[in-house]
Every structure is written in C-alpha cells, then in structure tokens.
C-alpha cells in the first residue's frame, strides 16, 4: 500500500495505491516486476492565486478538487550491491476534472534509475549513491543522490542529499519504524521554477 501527500504552491497531490510485485531469481540476482493501481486526488487552492486586476476565467477563485484512477508498471534488477530499474507512471494518462470546468491532464512519466551500495568497515552503515533520469516525452530531469543508511536489527535510519543540475538541492531523512518506512525530504530550488 502506498500513501502520498505532496504540496507544491497552490497544488496538493494525494495518492493511495495498491502494489504487487513478482520477484523471480535471474542471472544470479533478483528481478522484481511490479504493478500499481492508484486513486489520485488533486486540489488547487484558487483563493491563493493573484490574477492581477480583474478576474481571469482560466483561474479558479475557490478551492477546486478532483480525482482519477492511475496505473503504473516497473521492473527492478538487483545483483550484489548493484541495481537498475525502469518504470512508468500515469499510463492511463488521467485527466482530472477540478470543480466543474477545470481540467488537469497528467502525462505518462518514465523513469530510469541505477545505483550501488557501498559497504563500509562498520557493518551497520552503508553509503548508497544513485542516479535517476525521468521524462514525460517533452522534458527531462536528472538527479544524483547519496544516502547514508544505518541498519541494525530491523532498525533503519537514513539521511542524504540530492542534486538536480540547474534545478535543485534536496535534503532527506527517514527510517523504518515497526515495519513502516517514514521519510521527509525538502527540495530547495536553485533556479526559477519552470
């Protein structure tokens, strides 16, 4: 089960999803093939928008909400300390109707990731550098991230930094508590939001 709550400016993106993965052994490693079905809930707080003088009919003046069904697929392969993954979200290209007259089209997004887990002399600490490339077919974004992960007797804590060239720097912390993974990240933009 996946729960997500993300706020960016006047938008709030929420998702609840169910996932399933099949994990066969392949070439000395593990291949994970996954599928996800989700309910997307989107809202836009029009009371926070400044349309300047007069009213712009293209912008709502109240809070508007809508929802839609979404579908995703992914494949992930891990062998030893090396991993690589490929996935696609929003394969149904949902169009969320916000209120009575506003539409939010959501394009499919494709991801390619890879990384390596570096074991240190301290058996409880691992450094995990990784890279992520994502595209919706018209634009792309690349991120490089390094996390330091502490693992001991089912306890997992992590902290890390991420960098997206010309876009942002991200800090993150989190851990596993009673089998539930909880994390927080903050992204600081280094250029104007596009």
Map each language-model feature to its residues.
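Subset of outer-membrane beta-barrel
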Residues: 1-194
């Amino acid at each position: 089960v996946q729960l997500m709550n993300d706020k960016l400016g006047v938008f709030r993106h929420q998702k609840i999803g169910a996932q399933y993965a099949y994990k066969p052994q392949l070439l000395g490693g593990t291949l994970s093939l996954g599928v996800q079905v989700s309910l997307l809930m989107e809202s836009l707080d029009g009371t926070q928008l400044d349309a300047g003088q007069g009213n712009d009919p293209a912008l709502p003046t109240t809070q508007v909400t809508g929802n839609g069904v979404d579908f995703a697929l992914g494949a992930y392969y891990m062998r030893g300390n090396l991993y690589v993954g490929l996935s696609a979200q929003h394969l149904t290209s949902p169009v969320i109707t916000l209120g009575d007259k506003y539409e939010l089209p959501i394009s499919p997004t494709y991801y390619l990731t890879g990384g390596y887990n570096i074991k240190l002399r301290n058996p409880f600490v691992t450094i995990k550098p990784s890279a992520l490339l994502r595209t919706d077919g018209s634009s792309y974004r690349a991120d490089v991230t390094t996390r330091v992960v502490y693992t001991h007797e089912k306890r997992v804590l992590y902290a890390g930094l991420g960098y997206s060239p010309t876009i942002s720097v991200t800090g993150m912390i989190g851990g596993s508590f009673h089998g539930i993974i909880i994390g927080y990240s903050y992204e600081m933009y280094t250029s104007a939001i596009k």
